[in-house]
Regions:
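Core segments of cupin and vicinal oxygen chelate
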Residues: 1-2, 8-54, 136-179
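Vicinal oxygen chelate
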Residues: 12-15, 65-66, 70-113, 139-143, ...
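Active-site beta-strand termini and strand-to-loop segments that position acidic
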Residues: 41-47, 106-109, 172-176, 240-243, ...
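Exposed loop/turn and edge beta-strand positions of beta-sandwich/beta-sheet ligand-binding modules
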Residues: 3, 66, 100, 131, ...
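Short acidic/glycine-enriched loop/turn segments that link adjacent beta-strands
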Residues: 35-39, 98-102, 164-169, 190, ...
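N-terminal beta-strand motif that seeds the catalytic metal site of vicinal oxygen chelate
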Residues: 1-18, 67-70, 119-146, 158, ...
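Ordered, small/hydrophobic-rich secondary-structure cores
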Residues: 7, 28-96, 100
């Protein structure tokens, strides 16, 4: 079964970012015995592999602090067969063979980086909260992008939301565990991957951890707080910004899958 098993952020301080996600969301270090790299710092909720990837002076793609890419567990052959049925040519590029988890990569029709791995990302099946269960992608054409992920990765459409006042349109897809929102005319200005979403047992508990955890910020950096949106949003009501400024949604009920 094709499944989302990986997300990655680009950061200028991977130690600080992994410390934050460990203290606040209970993510643990995932040791990759094959990849000798100080840039890649893998952590996990037990199911999904999350890479806090340090930006290096020389990288194969333009780099900035952001939520950078998504990874699917699927074979090259299956992925290539599905890509061949798409209405434009998309070619797989082999990832560097340096011990990293993914085998191949490509850009989706709107330029978002997607990685694939036949053997997965070194994680198991875990259902204990908190769990990283959602991301949102800015879409120029949410219908077409949804068709792509349905075709190539067998994702199912589970929900739609249209907001007439802002002409925001969102399609929510699922692989059975992980949710992806494709949002056209998004209220978040960031292009590409716009946010991460954690299914949590209690938002109050996350708030308590933010207050009482050991330090994960530096002097004069603003305190991280849980914020709230109005109901006319394609995203969850509660969210925060991680130490790099990335948006992280919080939900006690989770996302429809």
């Amino acid at each position: 079964m094709v499944s989302v098993r990986h997300m990655a952020n680009l950061t200028k301080n991977n130690r600080r970012l992994t410390r934050f996600y460990g203290l606040i969301f209970g993510m643990d270090e995932l040791w990759n015995e094959w990849q000798n790299s100080s840039a890649a710092f893998y952590i996990t909720d037990g199911y999904l592999n999350f890479n806090c990837l340090e930006i290096l002076p020389v990288m194969s793609r333009p780099a900035s602090v952001r939520i950078d890419h998504i990874g699917f567990m699927v074979s090259k052959q299956e992925c290539e067969t599905k890509l061949a049925a798409w209405d434009q040519a998309i070619k797989l590029e082999q990832s560097p063979q340096d011990g990293r988890y993914e085998d191949w990569r490509f850009d989706d029709p709107e330029g978002n980086l997607v990685e694939i791995a036949a053997r997965g990302w070194g994680t198991e099946s875990n259902t204990k909260l908190p769990l990283l269960r959602h991301t949102a992608i800015h879409a120029q054409d949410h219908e077409r992008l949804a068709d792509f992920y349905k075709l190539v990765f067998d994702m199912k459409e589970v929900y739609r939301k249209d907001i007439a006042e802002t002409n925001t349109k969102a399609i929510y897809l699922s692989d059975g565990n992980f949710s992806i929102a494709l949002v056209q005319n998004s209220p978040i200005e960031t292009k590409g991957f716009q946010l991460l979403g954690f299914h949590v047992q209690s938002i109050a508990e996350i708030e308590e951890r933010l207050r009482k955890s050991p330090p994960f910020l530096y002097p004069r950096e603003p305190r991280i707080e849980i914020l709230r949106r109005t109901s006319d949003s394609p995203f969850k009501e509660h969210y925060l910004r991680d130490p790099d400024g990335n948006v992280v949604d919080l939900s006690e009920e989770g996302w429809e899958v």
